């Protein structure tokens, strides 16, 4: 008798993508992050759903409702901190996932890669709107500063900002719509994830060598299911340690002060996972230029496949490109550090140099290095 998982209309879809999926035999732990991101998304949707049951999106009560969740709701504190720190875990996994794809040349699967970039933008938008909801000082001023950037768009900028605000400043209308979109976007992200996987399974997974692995495939289950569970346990250990021992480690103390439009915090800065982009934004003295650089810091990933000059897909056997890749990682860490510092000497100039280096590595040095390596290999 044929197994039900291979014949049932719904189960056979799951079977072909989670059980009998042929996968390259050489996948390392760097390929774990896709499943970890899926689990992060599920955790965020579940904790968010339960938080939404107790949260009120009104400027008068939003801050108090979050306090009420932490103090009076059964296990509300753990829900709130799982959701807040789960976002940090989400971004750690996201950045490692993107880094893996850059290193091993997975961006040559352009459809999967482009959907991934859209997903990255969607997750960033969701996280930004979520940060506004507790209605603390940093929530209010973060929302004011970031939405105000749209006023740099010629002609329609000011009208656009007021349209997004629903008035002449960040107020009740803004908070309500941010809550609505923050609730909606994760479900759109879930749909995009399905499309991401659909395109991935059209081509099959890349592998560390970058060489086609059609001759050497193994079933996804049990080999990679077990491997993914190990990654999951490590991530859950890290997340629960963070939540239970220092839940506010990655947060901003200013957000424990209720929003006050009359009092600006000394240093307005976003959550740590946006600091690299924030540093690039601040490095350019012109407002419109800064906004463009901010968007391009992520959008530049879309042209990476066009800039692939090497005849090898992966960086596994390309030491010069590897050096550049790790220089890029160090540069991003430096930008993250700069984004959290005040706008004063020497941080400004360090940020400007790091921003120029970031775009130079991706747009100039990596393609040139690929050409040079081809020449060195006499190809």
From Swiss-Prot:
Binds 2 heme b groups non-covalently. The cytochrome bc1 complex contains 11 subunits: 3 respiratory subunits (MT-CYB, CYC1 and UQCRFS1), 2 core proteins (UQCRC1 and UQCRC2) and 6 low-molecular weight proteins (UQCRH/QCR6, UQCRB/QCR7, UQCRQ/QCR8, UQCR10/QCR9, UQCR11/QCR10 and a cleavage product of UQCRFS1). This cytochrome bc1 complex then forms a dimer. Belongs to the cytochrome b family. Its cofactor is heme b. Keywords: Electron transport, Heme, Iron, Membrane, Metal-binding, Mitochondrion, Mitochondrion inner membrane, Respiratory chain, Transmembrane, Transmembrane helix, Transport, Ubiquinone. GO terms for cellular component: mitochondrial inner membrane; respiratory chain complex III. Pfam families: Cytochrom_B_C (PF00032), Cytochrome_B (PF00033). PROSITE patterns: CYTB_CTER, CYTB_NTER. Heme b b566 binds at residues 97, 196. This is Cytochrome b. The chain crosses the membrane at residues 33-53, 77-98, 113-133, 178-198, 226-246, 288-308, 320-340, 347-367. It is found in: Mitochondrion inner membrane. GO terms for molecular function: metal ion binding; ubiquinol-cytochrome-c reductase activity.
């Amino acid at each position: 008798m044929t197994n039900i998982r291979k014949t049932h209309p719904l189960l056979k879809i799951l079977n072909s993508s989670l059980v009998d999926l042929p996968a390259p035999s050489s996948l390392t732990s760097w390929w774990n992050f896709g499943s970890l991101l899926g689990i992060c998304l599920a955790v965020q949707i579940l904790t968010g759903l339960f938080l939404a049951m107790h949260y009120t999106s009104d400027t008068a009560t939003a801050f108090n409702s979050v306090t009420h969740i932490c103090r009076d709701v059964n296990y509300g504190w753990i829900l709130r901190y799982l959701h807040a720190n789960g976002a940090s875990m989400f971004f750690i996994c996201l950045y490692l996932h993107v880094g893996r794809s850059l290193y091993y040349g997975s961006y040559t699967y352009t459809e999967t890669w482009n959907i991934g970039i859209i997903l990255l933008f969607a997750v960033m938008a969701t996280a930004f709107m979520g940060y506004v909801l507790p209605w603390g000082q940093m929530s209010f001023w973060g929302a004011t500063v970031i939405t105000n950037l749209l006023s740099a768009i010629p002609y329609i900028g000011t009208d656009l900002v007021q349209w997004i605000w629903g008035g002449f400043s960040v107020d009740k209308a803004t908070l309500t719509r941010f809550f609505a979109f923050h609730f909606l976007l994760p479900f759109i992200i879930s749909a995009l994830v399905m499309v991401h996987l659909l395109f991935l399974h059209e081509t099959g997974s890349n592998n560390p060598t970058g060489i086609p692995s059609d001759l050497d495939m193994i079933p996804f289950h049990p080999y990679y299911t077990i491997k993914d569970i190990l990654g999951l346990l490590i991530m859950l250990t890290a997340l629960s340690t963070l939540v239970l021992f220092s839940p506010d480690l990655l947060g901003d103390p200013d957000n424990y002060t209720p929003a006050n439009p009359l009092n600006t915090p000394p240093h307005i800065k976003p959550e740590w996972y946006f600091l690299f982009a924030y540093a690039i934004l601040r490095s350019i003295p012109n407002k419109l230029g800064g906004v463009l650089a901010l968007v391009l810091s992520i959008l530049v990933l879309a042209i990476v496949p066009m800039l692939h000059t090497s005849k090898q897909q992966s960086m596994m056997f390309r030491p010069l490109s590897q050096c550049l890749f790790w220089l890029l990682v160090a540069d991003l860490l430096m930008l993250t550090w700069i984004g959290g510092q005040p706008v004063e000497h020497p941080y400004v100039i360090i940020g400007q140099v790091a921003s120029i280096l970031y775009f130079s590595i991706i747009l100039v040095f990596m393609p040139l290095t690929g050409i040079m390596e081809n020449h060195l290999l006499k190809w």
